């Protein structure tokens, strides 16, 4: 944890420091301009290795950990004395006065809540759904809420609409625990957590105990996370549209830097009206930067778990694991690693790729690699593509299918072609692709501890990855 005591302005400064520390330590701002006594936390999930330590598993097998938990949900339990409701504001609500809202760049549309977990209860099944949606603050008690096509929250809203109701009671929870964040950060439709699946049960399985919830103070039918830092109670108003940026244009101007790496477009979306703000004593405001690894890690892990679950059903003998590279931006692509045992396993990498592409609707690219590849290292994956890929027989372009709009192929309707690259060596010719194995040495014995440390500091992550492996 990196603690910063100098004053930090939520306008541009906090986001700029968060961006500059991307992939590094978690950062706690202790002196937030305009909000005495308030703290802001970011980059908690910026490191995959750190997430793996939280879960007590090897980083390569985080997908298995999540997939197993999804099949053994632990139901949430209701409590009456929730820490997240220790302080409640139900009159004279002013979001900007209570919450240290951030603006990331000068080109942004305004101040945006990026870490608000929307908890909604399905009015038909009673299952809890959790999802993140960017929320530009419009007034003292109103924000936009951007809900992409295909999101389960949109389907829940449609159920309310079908019942003749224009308002969807929800809570927006900031600063939920790691298990809740991992269970609810899937970006869109994925087979592991289909519509009607209770995602708080998933979170309970991840943390080994039920998630605690409390009835909202001002919204019947809504529940707050009892352990959240901050909660905005309110309702989504389906009868009220508002533009995310002041000109009122739809899909023309930039909104803020998004997970795909570009400025996200501003749209006309539903509004969210805040009817109460509750929070812990001395709460900390969690601020994930959408473009940072913190967000793409949280988006990517549920996608990995969904692909892992699908692929192990297709061929548990050959499939090893899977991972989203940082450049794949959370859920736009996946690397799957296989280990064929005999000539009869040849071709299963292709079946696994088809399963991976179907397990998550946003998935646009899949690359299959052999068991000797470090799937977390983009250089090693690219080496496999270059040295083992056969672009005549090992490249597939699908017909038009559902993909993310963040892909270059993706249209406004979410249509595009999916891409698969077989970057595995032919099993029958595997001896041609044997890597050299050198003897292990302790550089400190040869160079001294200080010089050895200097060498390691200069080596790239790719070289460190290669030297750490014994084929």
Regions found by a protein language model. Name each.
Residues 1-271, 275-471:
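Extended, highly charged
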């Amino acid at each position: 944890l990196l603690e910063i005591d100098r004053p930090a302005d939520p306008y541009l400064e906090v986001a700029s420091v968060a961006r500059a520390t991307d992939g590094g330590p978690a950062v706690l701002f202790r002196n937030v301009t305009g909000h005495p006594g308030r703290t802001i936390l970011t980059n908690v999930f910026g490191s995959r290795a750190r997430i793996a330590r939280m879960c007590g598993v090897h980083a390569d097998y985080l997908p298995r950990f999540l997939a197993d938990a999804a099949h053994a949900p632990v139901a949430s339990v209701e409590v009456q004395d929730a820490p997240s409701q220790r302080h409640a504001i139900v009159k004279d609500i002013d979001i900007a006065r209570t919450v240290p809202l951030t603006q990331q760049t000068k080109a942004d549309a305004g101040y945006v809540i990026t870490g608000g977990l929307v908890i909604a209860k399905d009015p038909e099944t009673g299952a809890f759904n959790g999802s993140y949606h960017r929320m530009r603050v419009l007034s003292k008690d109103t924000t936009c809420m951007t809900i992409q096509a295909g999101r389960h929250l949109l389907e829940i809203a449609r159920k309310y609409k079908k019942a003749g109701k224009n308002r969807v009671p929800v809570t927006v929870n900031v600063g939920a625990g790691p298990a809740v964040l991992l269970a609810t950060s899937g970006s869109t439709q994925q087979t592991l957590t289909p519509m009607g699946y209770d995602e708080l049960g998933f979170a309970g399985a991840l943390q080994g105990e039920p998630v605690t919830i409390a009835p909202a103070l001002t919204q019947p039918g809504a529940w707050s996370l009892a352990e959240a830092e901050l909660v905005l109670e309110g309702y989504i108003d389906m009868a009220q549209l508002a533009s995310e940026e002041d000109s009122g244009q739809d899909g023309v101007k930039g909104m803020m830097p998004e997970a795909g790496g570009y400025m996200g477009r501003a749209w006309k979306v539903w509004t969210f009206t805040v009817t109460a703000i509750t929070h812990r004593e001395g709460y900390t405001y969690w601020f994930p930067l959408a473009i940072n690894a913190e967000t793409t890690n949280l988006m990517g892990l549920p996608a990995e778990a969904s692909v892992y679950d699908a692929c192990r059903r297709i061929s548990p003998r050959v499939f090893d694991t899977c991972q989203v590279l940082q450049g794949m931006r959370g859920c736009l692509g996946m690397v799957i690693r296989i280990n064929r045992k005999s000539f009869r396993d040849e071709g299963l990498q292709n079946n696994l790729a088809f399963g991976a592409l179907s397990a998550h609707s946003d998935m646009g690219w899949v690359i299959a690699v052999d068991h000797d590849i470090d799937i977390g290292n983009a250089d090693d994956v690219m080496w496999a593509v270059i040295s083992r890929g056969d672009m005549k027989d090992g490249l597939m372009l699908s017909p038009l299918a559902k993909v993310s709009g963040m892909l270059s192929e993706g249209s406004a309707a979410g249509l595009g072609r999916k891409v698969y690259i077989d970057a595995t060596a032919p099993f029958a010719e595997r001896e041609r692709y044997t890597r050299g194995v050198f003897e292990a040495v302790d550089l400190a014995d040869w160079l001294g501890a200080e010089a050895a440390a200097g060498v390691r500091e200069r080596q790239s992550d790719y070289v460190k990855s290669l030297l750490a492996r014994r084929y």
